[in-house]
Amino acid sequence: PMESGLYYLEFSDGSGSPLRVKGPETEEAKQAMVGGTESSLYIGAAKTNRFWAVSKFDLDTDEFYLDVEYAAPAGEITWRVSLRKKIAKFQRWMSRKKKRLFVRYFNFFSKHVKRTGNKIFFCSASRSRIGGNEQFIRDRMLERGLDKKFVFRYDFVASINERRSLRAFMRFGYYLATSDIIVLDDYYPQVYLPDYPPDVKVIQAWHACGAFKTVGLERMGKPGAPELNTRIHKCYTHIPVSSELSVRHNAEAFGLDESKFYPVGVPRTDIFFDPDYIRRTKKKMYEAFPQAKKAKTVYLYAPTFRGINARDAYFPFQKVDFVKWGQFCKETDACLLVKMHPFVRESVEIPPEYADYIIDAASYREVNDILFIVDVLITDYSSIIYEFSLLRRPMYFYAFDQKMYEATRDFYEPYEKTIPGQPIKSFDELMDTLREGKFDYQWLDSFVRKNFTYTDGKATDRVIDQIILGKK
């Protein structure tokens, strides 16, 4: 049986010679075939292994392809399908019921437990323990002795889909309802459900810098866009960002007033100005990746995922020739670290003959730590470019599907005007570019000035002083 996925079509005549099939003539017609959902082909007439297929068009390669999904066999379209529909309906009802109960639970403790003004709650639904911006804030507060003033509370789960015990969930709700300051670092559905008292601070210590890809309400009309009347993100009272440009971008994305955004800097960028941290981290990274210490040049390939969200995230690995990249590394005495986005579940297939030159760095969570041993970054649409730019090192942009990405996700500003470089469209062009090694540092300097109000390593202190402590 075939698998669900994207299938590019090759056409040939009766003798086997390839045929060029003419696609849509106008850009409007091409765009219409990018995100279509109406099934246009049905594959298989047997009782098993039947599939729906949607005919689509690749804007970057001018090729037709089929978006194929498994379809239930005829024998299944009876009591099994009916049962599944009933189960799904019951699950939706239960979900609504749970949300209402959670809000009532929150409201009870919020009303009857007096706040003391000193309880700060760190939480996340994307990591199992404290990390990222939240950890930098907490650790710096400890260094400054603020644990004598504040009571620290914590609740972390690896993902929004992770099941947890009733006791753990009730503790989360209690902390949420009785804390004076709530700090989160990503999307967290349960945080958006209740209404908070006006004196409670809800701080979104967002994990990304800059104003790059469209998010939230900026994605209207694109796959995965939120509803206009959504409660998502609306509870935030304070959001630290890296620049005035980020203020405008995130205000539009979250549908919030610009006054809720503070261009004080992003805490996790402080490490790029801390010589002791850099020295310790480089030693740790070389122990984790010994091949990197021996190499003349260390490359990092860190692309973002494709798809709408974590559930359907993927990466088109066929666009990367790891055999050619391995040969390049061997010839140039280089090392390639590959760090896929955490949403991508498929592992990188490294050619065995180049296992000493290509390393899958997926097991190491904090990509910023890896950056200190990297000489050259290769990415596409990842926000990693902001942190890496602070090191003033070359970066290249392998954007093989730029038009498709713009059609389905898009950018806050035009892609070519955002990145400190030029898009690279083919893998062979990428290899040629890496061999040449040319890079315009003027682009990089302009990029840093545009996206960082401060480059002094004191962002965490500003977040603590201006947002948590409320100093002017």
Name each model-derived stretch.
Residues 96-106, 209-219, 226-310, 314, ...:
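A nucleotide-sugar donor-handling region in carbohydrate enzymes
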Residues 160-228:
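Extended catalytic core of nucleotide-activated donor transferases of GT-like folds
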Residues 166-181, 189, 342-386:
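Donor nucleotide-activated moiety binding/catalytic core segment of transferases
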Residues 1-118, 143:
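Basic, ligand-binding patches in group-transfer machinery
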Residues 107, 277, 426-472:
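C-terminal amphipathic helix plus adjacent low-complexity
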Residues 350-354, 383-451:
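Catalytic binding pocket for nucleotide-activated donors in carbohydrate/polymer assembly enzymes
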Residues 182-211, 364-408:
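A donor-sugar binding/catalytic signature common to diverse glycosyltransferases
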Residues 129-140, 253, 261, 267-350, ...:
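Conserved catalytic-core segment of nucleotide-activated headgroup transferases in glycan assembly
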